Amino acid sequence: MVKPEKFIPKAVEKISKEIKDGRAIIALSGGVDSSVCAELAHRAIGGRLQPIYIDTGLMRKGETERIKHIFSHMNLDIVYAKDRFLAALKGITDPEEKRKAIGETFIRVFEEEARKLEADYLIQGTIYPDRIESEGGIKSHHNVGGLPSVMDFKKIVEPIEDLYKDEVREVAWALKLPDEICERMPFPGPGLAVRILGEVTEEKLEVAREANSIVEEELLDRFCPWQTFAAVIGKGTGVKGDIRAYGWIIAVRAVGSRDGMTAEALELPWDVLKKLESRITSEIPKVARVVYDITPKPPATIEFE
């Protein structure tokens, strides 16, 4: 287990040595990983750090506004790139190809922003499980295996690449980051794109966004899952108002875990599952069916893609 009082000064020193007197941008998502990196980097290089948040169009409901509010004290640069990411994903159905398309687009946007700022370094919040899954061929993370082979940066700096998620939270508490950040549930870097099986479309994104919002409203505060979400996994036949309906199938996932390397599905009460089904199918007319995924990790991964 990490000892924050020892880790923090070492990480700050490492960032200072790697960036020297250069300028850096940091990929800030608002999650605990990137937020910890931002605080460490700010302590290391101060005003030579520029945090950048990219609105990919693949975010949860209200995500960009939430980020603006939380980081209003910082000189946060927000880049709106929805059209660019959707164009990069058009026609792609394979999950690995989707992750790589997202990783490539992320890097190209960051390169463009870095050139404007004359920044030569990119700081990002890669953690140890990201590396394990990418290097082990389980799935490419957009910030590891999903990155292009040629990048216009002197170096990518990853201050917390050897930490597990629970260790990152310990460091976040020690850095006195806001509770909302320290306790924030993990959200994948590729966003809702990996909660949509097959090609990403505007319609699927809207369905996934609304379904995820409902699931979080119903489960987060009451059951405190390590992670919970909804995924669009295909289409199926249903009946609405005595009329045949061919609509989307939503899979709900809620798991408990310590570090994300293994996970168990939560045994949710039947009345809770019924309420989830009722809300999702009534509030999202294009949904015909709701299922609950009870598969642990392994053999499954937490996210569907």
Curated annotation (Swiss-Prot):
Keywords: ATP-binding, GMP biosynthesis, Ligase, Nucleotide-binding, Purine biosynthesis. GO terms for molecular function: ATP binding; GMP synthase activity. CDD domains: GMP_synthase_C. The keyword Nucleotide-binding applies. Its EC number is 6.3.5.2. It catalyses: XMP + L-glutamine + ATP + H2O = GMP + L-glutamate + AMP + diphosphate + 2 H(+). PROSITE patterns: GMPS_ATP_PPASE (PS51553). This is GMP synthase [glutamine-hydrolyzing] subunit B. It comes from Methanosarcina barkeri (strain Fusaro / DSM 804). The lineage of its organism: Archaea, Methanobacteriati, Methanobacteriota, Stenosarchaea group, Methanomicrobia. The gene is guaAB.
